[in-house]
Amino acid sequence: MIVKKLDDIIGTDSDVDTKTWRSYRFLLKKDGMGFSMHHTIIKENTETYIWYKNHLEAVYCIQGEGEIEVIDTGDVYSIQQGTLYALNGHEKHYLRARSEMHMVCVFNPPLTGREIHSADGSYPLAGE
């Protein structure tokens, strides 16, 4: 059994802070679950270009407001507490936060822990 608390994550290699988001990575590839799970905070009044070409992601908003824009279609979806979106087609998108958004994110394949978005908006596969 795996049991972790936020205090166990803060200030470790599983606490990744960037200009537009901070991610507390609770479950990673090394945990052997077949997916990774994170509590990610999207910083207020930010826009992040993302393209998970190597991963599938499901995201559940537990706090805050924003939107996701799918680049290829121009579709824009409102995000607020209680919203789930799943990037099941490797969609290129913009994630915008009107207020600080707290998100529970699940990735498959799992992340290893220190990934940040590359210039094309993606995370590398483990071992790349």
Q: Each PLM stretch: what is its role?
A:
Residues 69-71, 96:
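A generic structural motif
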